[in-house]
């Protein structure tokens, strides 16, 4: 009987700290996995860069063989100034065979979750929210945000850095092809405003805008915040409450997001909005995304960690989003293993490393 393999890559995790927590009985599931499979401290490849190590893990080859030495590389015959920085984890740079290519040659399926190696040359390989596609562009159309609505002045702020932006707030994006911004449109209705989230979808040449109509009613012992689009609406009535998922049809697919009421008084309302993804734009093949939305649920990014480290979001909300993401990954793996008969699943879990990368920006 053929076995199925799941490789869990905990980016930024310390083996010594994991071992300590396992010994203290605080990581029962990790301990169980270690007892059923294998777990060992890895020796990093030289040079010890992110793309170098992920390529080594994925191929079993050393950097001298696979050719991925750092962020960017130089290919034979090209000018010295050619860097290929954005393509450091793409297969055209790697000269060794990936393990999923070997699996594909045997007629079996593989799935890569937030992993390197797209676009692949092999059949039978699924990609979900892949790392470092061309132009360094992630497939979420809008990162998570925290909003402060001043009910007295009708002024809204959108948190980004340690100081909130006012009016129109341009969101920082890594890609050169995706423009994302949010704008508050003042309504004639009392205590009603529209949050307009606009974005351009990478490689699709599609520019979209989602407008959330916001109505807030606050009294001494009662609070109601309604958010609606032309196709969906939610209402929040208690502090700490999460909304149901909002599913918003667009010409690129179905967008999804949810909201949480952080605080509410007669002066202001604070809201958190999860990241926005479109069902057909975070997986390959695209139809896999629709299946995952139906059987697993909407996908979210890891970027709330940046808001948490900057003090813009509370620890409880951060942990709730992290738990949702972990539950989603577990359900996704089970779905791929059973419904799609995937033999190899490779996961790159980035939450810990996302927090570590965010620390310098908080300090400086």
Model-derived features: where do they sit?
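Beta-strand elements within well-structured catalytic alpha/beta cores of enzymes
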Residues: 2-19, 33, 57, 103, ...
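Extracellular/periplasmic catalytic domains that process cell-envelope and extracellular macromolecules
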Residues: 1, 50, 338-341
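His/Asp/Glu-rich, glycine-adjacent segments
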Residues: 62-364
